[in-house]
């Protein structure tokens, strides 16, 4: 599948990511949205170049597109997810950037109805990385760093 085909296929998701970021009221929401598009494109490129796997390439594009979906979520929304899911986490504003990855799967499942565990894990670990990362996790981690 070509990149343009994926951009068309996931136009609705892209629009929803844009609206989520815009609704945050954060002054950098447009920059963040453009970053997400860049990460999606880079992830697609890396998956094609290093794995030549159409399924992985599509997952890489989608994961890149939504990886910062929760970047500007308010503290009370994070705390609600933590409480509602009985997570053993205490929110700390000093490490806020870690939470948008860690808690993103909960928001993405509920708001975007994306349940692919491989995609959700790649998003969960895109900030910190971890040992024994899957190919998709590595692709999203590296794509995000390359697009800072």
Give the residues covered by each predicted segment.
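Short coil/turn linker and secondary-structure boundary residues
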Residues: 1-4, 8, 12, 52-55, ...
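Generic N-terminal amphipathic, Lys/Arg-enriched alpha-helix
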Residues: 3-28
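Divalent metal-dependent catalytic cores for phosphoryl transfer on phosphate-bearing substrates
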Residues: 20-26, 44, 49-148
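A short, charge-rich alpha-helical start-of-domain segment used by transcription regulators
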Residues: 30-33
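DNA target-recognition patches
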Residues: 36
